[in-house]
């Protein structure tokens, strides 16, 4: 989860989040290199003696500044597309979880387990011995290290189901079903919030995901049934 003075990503807890962080680092290295080169050229132009003052054209330079940006864009493009398809492609999920956005709370369904269904509301301030605006009365429970399918939609306006540490952000659109892969690589409790402005209480739509062992998950399913 986010903390004060945190300027980087949250600690990644899924393969997708790892890939996104690595991609971000690669892009930032490219941006820093380009920025450094640009600043150097600017200072060099100010400090030189105008030795190329009457240079009107140079085909070699023009070819270089056309090819180099194309190569840089391709270097950025291919990893980006790979991550995009990895997140969107559903490969043999163990089961599906349906997340439905409402104004201003979430509901969850487990269709493969006797249609378990429950609502998830933000806890009141008076209940706080926990994290402000992030704790919910019911958590979405998932088994760790098992590929799942998250299906999301909405009953009213557009919401967005987002858990940064899992590398997940998917819009919940009324009348439409979106899906993506969901997998956690370690046990823990992960926090998120609705990331699409959806009305007056948009800021009070927290998401709480608990990743547990498969044995504990099945015990929870048994109790819910």
UniProtKB/Swiss-Prot annotation:
Cofactor note text: Binds a dinuclear copper A center per subunit.
Any Pfam family the entry gives: COX2
Cofactor: Cu cation
EC number: 7.1.1.9
Known catalytic reactions: 4 Fe(II)-[cytochrome c] + O2 + 8 H(+)(in) = 4 Fe(III)-[cytochrome c] + 2 H2O + 4 H(+)(out)
Residues that hold Cu cation A2 according to the record: 194, 196, 198, 202
GO biological process, one term: ATP synthesis coupled electron transport
Membrane-topology annotation of the record: Multi-pass membrane protein
Domain of life: Eukaryota
Stretches assigned to the Mitochondrial matrix side: 48-62
Keywords, comma-separated and alphabetical: Copper, Electron transport, Magnesium, Membrane, Metal-binding, Mitochondrion, Mitochondrion inner membrane, Respiratory chain, Translocase, Transmembrane, Transmembrane helix, Transport
Cell compartments where the protein resides: Mitochondrion inner membrane
Residues where Mg(2+) binds: 196
Gene Ontology, cellular component aspect: mitochondrial inner membrane
An example molecular function term from Gene Ontology annotations: copper ion binding
Stretches assigned to the Mitochondrial intermembrane side: 1-25, 83-225
Assembly mode: Component of the cytochrome c oxidase (complex IV, CIV), a multisubunit enzyme composed of a catalytic core of 3 subunits and several supernumerary subunits. The complex exists as a monomer or a dimer and forms supercomplexes (SCs) in the inner mitochondrial membrane with ubiquinol-cytochrome c oxidoreductase (cytochrome b-c1 complex, complex III, CIII).
Family to which this protein belongs: Belongs to the cytochrome c oxidase subunit 2 family.
Record function comment: Component of the cytochrome c oxidase, the last enzyme in the mitochondrial electron transport chain which drives oxidative phosphorylation. The respiratory chain contains 3 multisubunit complexes succinate dehydrogenase (complex II, CII), ubiquinol-cytochrome c oxidoreductase (cytochrome b-c1 complex, complex III, CIII) and cytochrome c oxidase (complex IV, CIV), that cooperate to transfer electrons derived from NADH and succinate to molecular oxygen, creating an electrochemical gradient over the inner membrane that drives transmembrane transport and the ATP synthase.
Protein name, per record: Cytochrome c oxidase subunit 2
Organism, as annotated: Apis florea (Dwarf honeybee)
Lineage: Eukaryota, Metazoa, Ecdysozoa, Arthropoda, Hexapoda
